């Protein structure tokens, strides 16, 4: 059963913020090959706290899935981009190079429903993909009330706190 993620301590996020304030994010990026078996692409993520290694492990596992499932993860719509969370003044995890958005055409996002008071949750991302990301320390935007099913961000401290 899918559950929503709660809050937890933020040592990882504090480290990301410190690096971003110093303007050092770009110097800490690493290019990895995303889903090479399925004709994926090169993406850039941070090396801080092993985000690059975690995403590489995710890529290797998803690359072993059948094409009809892996296609939900191709192409990557974005990783590193210095920006804010839509509608806020908070930096997105994309600004730290610690988030990935998957295939937009296979995703659902609450804002796409217009101005509904209570958006109806929708999802097309296979749970097999979600489980692989979570196994490697990523949280899924599909678990949020204001859902964003294409979005995964590296927040291992939240995964660990949920398991306790």
Residue ranges of model-derived segments:
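Basic/polar, cationic surfaces and motifs that engage anionic cell-wall
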Residues: 147-164
């Amino acid at each position: 059963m899918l559950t929503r993620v709660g809050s937890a301590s933020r040592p990882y996020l504090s480290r990301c913020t410190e690096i971003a304030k110093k303007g050092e994010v770009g110097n800490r990026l690493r290019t990895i090959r995303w889903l090479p078996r399925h004709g994926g692409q090169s993406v850039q993520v941070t090396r801080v706290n092993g985000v690059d290694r975690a995403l590489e492990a995710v890529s290797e596992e998803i690359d072993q899935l059948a094409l009809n499932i892996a296609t939900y993860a191709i192409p990557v719509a974005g990783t590193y981009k210095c920006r804010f969370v839509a509608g806020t003044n908070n930096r997105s995890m994309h600004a730290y190079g610690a988030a990935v958005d998957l295939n937009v055409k296979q995703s659902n996002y609450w804002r796409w429903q217009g101005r509904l008071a209570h958006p109806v949750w929708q999802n097309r991302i296979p749970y097999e993909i979600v489980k692989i990301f979570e196994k490697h320390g990523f949280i899924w935007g599909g678990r949020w009330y204001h859902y964003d099913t294409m979005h995964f961000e590296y927040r291992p401290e939240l995964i660990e706190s949920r398991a306790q």
